[in-house]
């Protein structure tokens, strides 16, 4: 039986059960939290809240969540471990990668081939270490990769992360999920780069593609081979009315009758806490 890494160790894929494919236990701005969170962040309260919410999820029949929280989204595995210890009925699958809409964090931007400080490419080495050795001494191994291609497209920083993700995929075989911007059709850019880099496109998930009601765009993505062609929160923020967010089931209603051969994912894109201070007005 094939196995997959989880927060509580390797598990047989047969044990995954009902799975939500794109959920965040926490999304945090770590430096803001550490420097300014004292008045509004209580670690014990947030952990307890996370335990309660994930326990409720298990009670509704969910046995696995796939958490694409990586560097840039406040990944901190010890906190997730604490919660998972208290929700033993839930498997949590975690990721490695880097989340940025444009430029790299300065640490990486100044290090690597062609940068001010030169040196080897660090990103792929770090991603591979997270998968093979575990994340930050926790022993928890990443099971998939995460990157972003947003509105600005394949900027130098975005391209460098994406190529490091592709290199890691070739080395380890783990799948990839990409945050895309459906309004700007950046899923196409992601597939173009990954195809050129020799990535197995059947192991690529194009996240948030369901934010679009453009069925031709969605069909073009799926016709290129990814069996899990989009994730969607059921809302559109890329093509909304001026007033804000709205439910976006149109693509699902129109695509479903003709798309039974296109396996899709429809997760919630949910978090127990985004680490925001309370509103004061």
Residue ranges and their predicted role:
Residues 166, 170-250, 260:
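Catalytic pocket-lining loop regions of alpha/beta-barrel enzymes
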Residues 17-28, 34-91, 119-141:
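Alpha-helical scaffold segments that flank or form the walls of functional sites
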Residues 29-33, 77, 104-106, 186-194, ...:
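Histidine/acidic-residue-rich catalytic or RNA/ligand-binding cores of hydrolases
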Residues 22, 65, 169, 228, ...:
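Divalent metal-coordination and catalytic microenvironments
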Residues 177, 230-233, 257-278:
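Short acidic/histidine-rich active-site segments
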Residues 82, 86, 91-175, 227, ...:
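Active-site gating/metal-coordination segments in enzymes
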Residues 24-26, 70-71, 95-101, 150, ...:
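Active-site beta-loop-alpha junctions enriched in small/polar residues
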Residues 23-48, 96-120, 141, 264-281:
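Active-site gating loops and adjacent loop-to-helix segments of metal-dependent hydrolytic enzymes
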């Amino acid at each position: 039986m094939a196995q997959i890494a989880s927060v509580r160790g390797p598990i047989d894929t047969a044990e995954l059960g009902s799975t939500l494919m794109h959920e965040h236990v926490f999304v945090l701005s770590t430096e803001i939290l550490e420097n300014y969170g004292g008045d509004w962040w209580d670690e014990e309260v947030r952990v307890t809240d996370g335990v309660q919410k994930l326990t409720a999820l298990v009670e509704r029949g969910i046995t696995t969540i796939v958490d694409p929280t990586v560097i840039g989204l406040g990944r901190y595995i010890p906190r997730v471990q604490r919660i998972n210890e208290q929700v033993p009925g839930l498997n949590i699958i975690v990721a490695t990668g880097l989340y940025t809409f444009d430029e790299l964090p300065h640490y990486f931007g100044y290090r690597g081939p062609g940068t001010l400080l030169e040196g080897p490419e660090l990103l792929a080495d770090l991603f591979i270490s997270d998968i093979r050795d575990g994340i930050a001494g926790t022993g928890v191994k990443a099971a998939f990769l995460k990157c972003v291609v947003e509105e600005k497209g394949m900027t130098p920083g975005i391209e460098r992360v994406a190529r490091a993700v592709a290199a890691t995929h070739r080395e380890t075989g783990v799948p990839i999920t990409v945050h895309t911007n459906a309004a700007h059709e950046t899923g196409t850019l992601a597939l173009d780069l990954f195809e050129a880099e020799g990535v197995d496109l059947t192991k690529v998930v194009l996240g948030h593609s369901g934010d679009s009601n453009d069925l031709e765009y969605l069909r073009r993505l799926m016709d290129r081979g990814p069996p899990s062609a989009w994730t969607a929160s059921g809302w559109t923020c890329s093509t909304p009315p001026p007033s804000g967010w709205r439910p976006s089931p149109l693509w699902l209603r129109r695509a479903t009758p003709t798309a039974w051969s296109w396996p899709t994912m429809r997760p919630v894109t949910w978090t127990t806490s985004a680490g925001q201070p309370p509103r004061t007005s």
